[in-house]
Every structure is written in C-alpha cells, then in structure tokens.
C-alpha cells in the first residue's frame, strides 16, 4: 500500500456526505422492512464510507473480480449498510434497498452469497474474521497478489473465542494484507458490551496477538483515512470508537434499540435531519484494483496415476487419505491442506512433506480452521482439505453450518472414528459425526472402507460442490478393491453376493470388514449373506439397497461404528421407509464407550463379527 496522503477538504466532505447517505438508506430500508438493525448500521457509516470510497480498490460492477480487495461484514446484522454501499457504488438499484428482507429479494436479513458482493455468509457472530484470514492467507501466500482484505467486527462478537483464534492465526502468519475494523459502539443486543468504550483494553489485547493497532474516532473520516493508510509488516487492527445509532436524535447511544427499525414518522423526521447535513449529491467512484492475481482453474482435478494397492494388503484409511491427498497435490497447485496439530495422526503430514508451501498448520483451533478453509475457497481460488479427529469437528459445527449457507466448497476429513480407535477412550471417538454431517444441507458424506476407496473419495471430493466429509478409521484393514474399480458419489458396492443370499448386511469402514468375516463364519451354517459397502452415506444408493433387500427376502441388517442416532442405520431406514416387505435391523454403539482394545470394544458394543452372525441367524430363524 502506498504511503498515506491526506485527502483534501472536498474529498473529506464527500466522504461525510456518503456516510450520511448510507445512514439514510439503512434507516429507509429497515423501516420499509419493519425489521432490521438500523442503529448497528449507523455506528458504522463513516467506516463503510471511507473503506469503500477511499481505501478499497475494486471494480464496482464486478464484485467478485479476483483482483478486487475483499470485504467481510462479520457483524452481519448490519447488512443494510452493506447493501447501501453497493447501491451507492452503482451495482444495486437504490429502489431495491426498499425490498430488504422480502422473499422476492436477494437482500436477506444477513449477508448471503446469492449476493455477488458477499463471499461468505455472516450473521452467526464471531466467524467473519476467520474467513477473512483465509482470504488474506490465500492472497499473500498462494496468489501472491496485491489485493487486501478488510473485515468489520462488532464489539459484541468479540466475546466469541473464535475471534481470538483468528487473531492468533493472523499474528502468527503475519498477514499484513489484512485489516480488522472493530466497531466499538458500546452496546450489545440486550446489555452494554463487556468493555463498553474501554478502547485501550481492546488495543492491548490486539497488540498481544501480534497486530499493529490504532485507536480512532470512528466517526471522523479524516482519522479513518489516516488509519487505513498505515501499512505495517503485520496485520492491522483499527479500534473505532463509535456510537450506536449515530445521527438518530434521541436514540444515539441509548439501550433497548438493538434490532428495532424506526417507526415511519420518526424515520421521516430523522432522515430530514441527516439529509440537511449532506452538502453534495455527487457520488465518489470506486478506485479500480491492480490486476495481478493469477488466473486459476480448479475444475476437473484428477489423480495423476491410478491407485497402486494390492488386494489383501493392509492399510488404515487415515493413512490412505494422507497418501491420496499428497498424490492429488501433484495434479494441481491449488490443492491445499489444513490441519489442527494432528497431522501425524490424520497423515496430512504426507501432504506437507511433498507440498510444504501449501500446508497450513492451524493448531488446536478447529473452529478457526474451518473458517480459514472457507476463506481460502472463496472466488474459487483453492480446493481446501481440512483434517483432524472427526470428534473434534463437532466443535466447529456452527462454522460448518455457516459454510453450507456460504455455498462453500470445502473438504473435511475426520479420522479416529468410532470405538475402533481403542485405548484412547470416548473423548477421542467420533460417534456423532455421521449424524452431524448428514444434517448439513447439500453435503456429501464419504465413508471409504479400504485404501482404493479412500483414494477415490479424495479425488471425488475435490470435484464435488458443497461440504464434503471423508470419515477415516484408525485400524489397518485389508484392501478389498482392485485398483481399476470405479467409484462414484451415490453408488454403493456389492462386495459379496450369491443367488442364495438370505440377508443384506450393510457396513462401512471397520464394520464392513467385520461383515465379510461374519460371512465366512456363516458359511459353516450354510447361510449366505449379501454384503454392501455404501461408500457414500449421503447420498445413499437407495436403488441398490432396495434391489439387494428384495433379493434377500426383504431383510436388511446395518452395522456401524457410530451411535444409533443419525448414522447408517437411520439413513438406510429413511431410504426404504414405506417399501412393503422390507425391514431394517440395526447394530450400533448404544452408550458412551470406554477404553479398551479395538476388538474388545467392537464386541462389547455388539458390532463385531460375532454380533453380526447372531443377528443374521436371528433374522433367518424368524423366517
């Protein structure tokens, strides 16, 4: 960024006028909608005016241009002022602002990516800065471009721990292309924010995390211009002391006005008061960006070579994941890996070894890791793969939920699933993860059962839109597929079948191998079973499951290393509900487990070979 040049008085007045027009638009829109957050918008008016019409470089009619500076409104409830900015810039018709929150309009109550100027959905507070960190990391280390990233946070959301995870990340990686603006307007939703206007404490906290920190009067366009003009070799935090409801007589800095639109009569009077301060209707044109971001193509990324496993050899799917990701990294320099200090367990360390410049260590901060991945994936700049123990992704469920709302394309690999991890005990065992990821809109849930399937899952995930989850296991199990086996999303595999099959058994990961062992044991009793590998739990191959059930007298037995709720059994039951003559019997983990050897735990919770044998015999005996 060039050195600071003080704007002349004409430019400063134009910025003041712009801020007041943004105030007016925010009040008009929320009053027309009958809901919204005008006071939260008004505290940020000067910040937004200076950012978009003095500091940022972007093409106003092409908001997602890869060269543009980025902006994340972490305090998403102030969406009306963001919409007002894009109307002021000429991208939105001003009349559209009056359709705020209507079902016929794209201007939702909080920012969402159906708006071309919104990269990530916000509104669940505390997440915007993490996404901004991902954008800034991508700009600095992958794109090596001059675009900068700005994120505005409210003081209420600074109580969220995820904010400080992001602050730490930016400080560690010296993201000097990132600016966080803290709108310290003193008031939260139901009470004052904990620090109110103690801006010096905010400053000390930010500095402790490695940020260059500046305190400003958030309603002084001159102070804001100067603060944004300071370039340092570290991220910058601007602590802007503001007043909630600034410019609204009788409401400014008053409690009990959060999320309340002004009544029509009051709004008209306030708008007249604010408008009387506007000296010129002339609008400031956006400054175009420097066009130095590289052209990127992340479509159709394929493995450079087929799998190279041997049927019968043993490998844990968690290790197969690391090998597959490292291999895929050679197909595109836009494949990146993130981990939460578990890379020697998830085997993402294999990717780091071969592609060290594309590995991001996020440390033990899973919420932030997911937000970083979302930021890295914006504008199709990268294809991120995040990994940690599957159990620890539960901590980041809100970030994953918001990633889906953001229409983000990120891939999450959770290792150490189920009781089969053994001695580490229940705190490390993922037993809720299938339920969690199945509930995410438009998600794809992979559950590979050998090394070949894992490699195919990684390749498919890289080319599948939405949130992809790959569930991997700790135990080593045999390779059961040939290297040329074709895998597709939503296509299950019949691993074992005969014309005399009496029960269809569906397992995945460890339990698929237990099912195959059970099939061998049942042969002694002249009982044949059909064994299915679903490969993806979502979407599920309903047709193959039903065809198999009909061929085995309508009997389905599911067995899974997961709790009963939300797992494979419930997915299969939902898929076949209403089908005459088809019944589903389920085996799953029924209570909080304990430490023990994997085989002991599989037996204790009734999901091992012997439990499958007994369940099959029971179904056959019933007739």
Swiss-Prot record:
It is an enzyme of class 2 (transferase). InterPro entries: THDP-binding (IPR029061), Transketo_C/PFOR_II (IPR009014), Transketolase-like (IPR051424), Transketolase-like_Pyr-bd (IPR005475), Transketolase_BS (IPR020826), Transketolase_C (IPR033248), Transketolase_CS (IPR049557), Transketolase_N (IPR005474). It comes from Mus musculus (Mouse). The keyword 4Fe-4S does not apply. This is Transketolase. Keywords: Acetylation, Calcium, Isopeptide bond, Magnesium, Metal-binding, Phosphoprotein, Thiamine pyrophosphate, Transferase, Ubl conjugation. Belongs to the transketolase family. Substrate binds at residues 37, 258, 318, 345, 416, 424, 474. There is a cross-link at residue 352 (Glycyl lysine isopeptide (Lys-Gly) (interchain with G-Cter in SUMO2)). Mg(2+) binds at residues 155, 185, 187. The active site is at residue 366. It catalyses: D-sedoheptulose 7-phosphate + D-glyceraldehyde 3-phosphate = aldehydo-D-ribose 5-phosphate + D-xylulose 5-phosphate.
């Amino acid at each position: 960024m060039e050195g600071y040049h003080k704007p002349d008085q004409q430019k400063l007045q134009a910025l003041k006028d712009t801020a007041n027009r943004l105030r007016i638009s925010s009040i008009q829109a929320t009053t027309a909608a009958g809901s919204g957050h005008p006071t939260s918008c008004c505290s940020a008016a000067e910040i937004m005016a200076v950012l978009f019409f003095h500091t940022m470089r972007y093409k106003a009619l092409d908001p997602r241009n890869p060269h543009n500076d980025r902006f994340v409104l972490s305090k998403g409830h102030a969406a009306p002022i963001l919409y007002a900015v894009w109307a002021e810039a000429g991208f939105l018709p001003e009349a559209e602002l009056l359709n705020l929150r209507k079902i016929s309009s794209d201007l939702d109550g909080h920012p969402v990516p159906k708006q071309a100027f919104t990269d990530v959905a916000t509104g669940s507070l505390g997440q915007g800065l993490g996404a901004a960190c991902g954008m800034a990391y991508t700009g600095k280390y992958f794109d090596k471009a001059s675009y900068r990233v700005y994120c505005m946070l409210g003081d209420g959301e600074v109580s969220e721990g995820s904010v400080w995870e992001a602050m730490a990340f930016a400080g560690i990686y010296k993201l000097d292309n990132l600016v966080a603006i803290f709108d310290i307007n003193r008031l939260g939703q139901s009470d004052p924010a904990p620090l109110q206007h103690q801006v010096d404490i905010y400053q000390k906290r930010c500095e402790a995390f490695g940020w260059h920190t500046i305190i400003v009067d958030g309603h002084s366009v001159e102070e804001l211009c100067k603060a944004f003009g300071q370039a340092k070799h570290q991220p910058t935090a601007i602590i802007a002391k503001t007043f909630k409801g600034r410019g609204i007589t009788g409401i400014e800095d008053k409690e009990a006005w959060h999320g309340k639109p002004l009544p029509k009569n009051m709004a008209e009077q306030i708008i007249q008061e604010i408008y009387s301060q506007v000296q010129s209707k002339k609008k400031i044109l956006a400054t175009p960006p420097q066009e130095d971001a590289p052209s990127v193509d992340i479509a159709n990324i394929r493995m450079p070579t087929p799998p190279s496993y041997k049927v019968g050899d043993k490998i844990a799917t968690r290790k197969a994941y690391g090998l597959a990701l490292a291999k895929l990294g050679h197909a595109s320099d836009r494949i990146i890996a993130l981990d939460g200090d578990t890379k020697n367990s998830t085997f993402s360390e294999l990717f780091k070894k071969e592609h060290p410049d594309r590995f991001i260590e996020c440390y033990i901060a899973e919420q932030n890791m997911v937000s970083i991945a979302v930021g890295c994936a914006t504008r199709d700049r990268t294809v991120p793969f995040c990994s940690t123990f599957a159990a620890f992704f539960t901590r980041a469920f809100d970030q994953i939920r918001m990633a889906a709302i953001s229409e983000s394309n990120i891939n999450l690999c959770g290792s150490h699933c189920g009781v089969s991890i053994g001695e580490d005990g229940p705190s490390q065992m993922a037993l809720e993860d299938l339920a969690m990821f199945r509930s995410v809109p438009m998600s794809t849930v992979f559950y590979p059962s050998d090394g070949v399937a894992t490699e195919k899952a990684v390749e498919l995930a890289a080319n599948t839109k939405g949130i992809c989850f790959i569930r991997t296991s700790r135990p080593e199990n045999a390779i059961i597929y040939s290297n040329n086996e074709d895998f597709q999303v939503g296509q299950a595999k019949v691993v074992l079948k005969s014309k005399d099959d009496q029960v269809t058994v569906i397992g995945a990961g460890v339990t698929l191998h237990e099912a195959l062992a059970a099939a061998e044991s049942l042969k002694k009793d002249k009982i044949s079973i059909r064994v299915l590998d679903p490969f993806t739990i979502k979407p599920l191959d309903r047709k193959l499951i039903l065809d198999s059930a009909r061929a085995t007298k309508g009997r389905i037995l599911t067995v899974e290393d997961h709790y009963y709720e939300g797992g494979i059994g419930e997915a299969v039951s939902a898929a076949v509900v209403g089908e005459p003559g088809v019944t589903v019997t389920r085996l799953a983990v029924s209570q909080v487990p304990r430490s023990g050897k994997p085989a002991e735990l599989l037996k204790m919770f009734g999901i091992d070979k012997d439990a499958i044998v007994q369940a099959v015999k029971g179904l056959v005996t019933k007739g």
